[in-house]
Structure formats: C-alpha cells, structure tokens
C-alpha cells in the first residue's frame, strides 16, 4: 500500500531528499502523449463510449489502468542506484514509457486513482520494486498530501545478478563464445522484457482471483 506522508513537513522533506522535479506539458511532451503535466490524461464520456465500442468482441486485459477520473498527486522517489524508467499501463493495458529518473531524484506526477505503474532499469530493463511490490496503483490523497512511490532494487537471486553482470560486460553476439554451460546461453539471451513480466503478472492475478472465488 502506498506510503503517505504523515504531514506536509514530511512530504516536503521527502521531496527535497529525492530531488523532486515537477514536469509540465512542454517538458514532458504532454500534448504528444496525452499527458496532463507529467501524468496520463483521463478520457471524457464521449471517448469512453468510443473505447467501449472498439473493445466490443475482444477481452479487456486484466492489467490496465481504470478510468476513474479521480486525480491523485504522487511523488516518484528513485531510491535505487539505477536510472529508472517509469512505465504507465494505459486503458488498453499497453505499456507507455515516461521520462527517466536519475538515481536519488524524484518527480511529482499528476496521476489518477486506479492507474497502474511499474518501474524498470532504463538501460537493462531489469525489474524494480515500488513500495516493495511490482505494481504501483495510486490511491486518493488524504488532506492534500501526496502519495510516495519509493522505487528500490529487489533482492535479485545470485543467478539473476550474475546474468546482469555478464550482459553488462559481453555483447549479445559474443554470448555463445563464452566457456559456460549451454543452458546459460539461453538465459543470457532471455533479456528482461516488460511484456513478458506483464504476462506473468496477469497469470498471477488470475490465479489469485480464482483462489478467492
């Protein structure tokens, strides 16, 4: 569950510590991406009707942003040593990348309740955690206080970390020249991929829903 600042002072301190920036439409390419300042834009009633007609006859994705039309002020805090790529899942469940956050910085985002965000290493696409989980869903603000999304490194397995290091040192075309077990060639070539992670998270969500039935 997103961490809320206990008071405005804490919110200000958290923002200063993370080097928070607030991006307007011009800096964020808002007009091109349909973003409101640094966050995605909600659809109006007419657009919703058109979306529903287009979606008729095909299943709606399990993981997608909900068009709640309820604003939520969020601060993305990059507390990892990696350059972070925020990714918003739009209303069709398609990943939409947003401007990167350098280590130790933050950004105020104008998002909405029910929107889905995930975060990746901008260079390697390794998965990162947000508030100790893989998906971030903004809730409503309480007394105008922003929701903090703290982005951190997960505890990678030894194998995962070794694969990351080898990928950083060896070009993909040279993987199979390494004197290692053959199965590791395939592991090295299986680069992190947002779409694959979304498929896995979707299956986990479906399994969890079935267990709850």
Swiss-Prot record:
**Impact upon substituting residue 158 to P:** In VHLD; type I-II; abolishes release from chaperonin complex and the interaction with Elongin BC complex
Name of the protein in its database record: von Hippel-Lindau disease tumor suppressor
> Per UniProt, what does mutating residue 91 to L do?
In cerebellar hemangioblastoma; uncertain significance
The record lists the organism as: Homo sapiens (Human)
Name the consequence of residue 78 to S: In VHLD; type I
Per the record, what is the consequence of mutating residue 166 to D?
A: In VHLD; with RCC
**Region of interest called Interaction with Elongin BC complex, as start-end residue ranges on this chain:** 157-166
Impact of mutating residue 128 to F? In VHLD; type II
The record gives the effect of mutating residue 184 to R as:
In VHLD; type I
Listed result of changing residue 89 to H: In lung cancer
Recorded consequence of changing residue 25 to L: In PCC; benign
Query: Quick one: effect of changing residue 167 to G?
Result: In VHLD; type I-II
Q: What is the effect of changing residue 86 to L?
A: In VHLD; type I
GO CC aspect terms = cilium; cytosol; endoplasmic reticulum; intracellular membraneless organelle; microtubule cytoskeleton; mitochondrion; nucleoplasm; nucleus
- Altering residue 76 to S: what's the impact? In VHLD; type I
Mutation: residue 180 to V; reported impact is: In VHLD; type I
Which keywords does this Swiss-Prot/TrEMBL entry list?
Cell membrane, Congenital erythrocytosis, Cytoplasm, Disease variant, Endoplasmic reticulum, Membrane, Nucleus, Repeat, Tumor suppressor, Ubl conjugation pathway
Record note on what altering residue 38 to P does: In VHLD; type II
Consequence of changing residue 80 to N: In PCC and VHLD; type I
- Compositionally biased residues, Acidic residues: 8-54
Gene that codes for this? VHL
Q: In which tissues is it expressed?
A: Expressed in the adult and fetal brain and kidney.
């Amino acid at each position: 569950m997103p961490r809320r600042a206990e008071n405005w002072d804490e919110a200000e301190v958290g923002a200063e510590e993370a080097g928070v920036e607030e991006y307007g439409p011009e800096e964020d390419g808002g007009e091109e991406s349909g973003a409101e300042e640094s966050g995605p834009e909600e659809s109006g009633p007419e657009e919703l009707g058109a979306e529903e007609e287009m979606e008729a006859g095909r299943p709606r994705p399990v993981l997608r942003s909900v068009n709640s039309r309820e604003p939520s002020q969020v601060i993305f805090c990059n507390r990892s040593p990696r350059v972070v790529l925020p990714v918003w899942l739009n209303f069709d469940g398609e990943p939409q990348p947003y401007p990167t956050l350098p280590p130790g910085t933050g950004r105020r985002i104008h998002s909405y309740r029910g929107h889905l965000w995930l975060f990746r290493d901008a260079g390697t696409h390794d998965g990162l955690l947000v508030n100790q989980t893989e998906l971030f869903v903004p809730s409503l603000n309480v007394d105008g206080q922003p929701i903090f999304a703290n982005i951190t490194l997960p505890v990678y397995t030894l194998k995962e970390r070794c694969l990351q290091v080898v990928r950083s040192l060896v070009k993909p075309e040279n993987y199979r020249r390494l004197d290692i077990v053959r199965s590791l060639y395939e592991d090295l070539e299986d680069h992190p991929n947002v779409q694959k992670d979304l498929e896995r998270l979707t299956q986990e969500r479906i399994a969890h829903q079935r267990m709850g039935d």
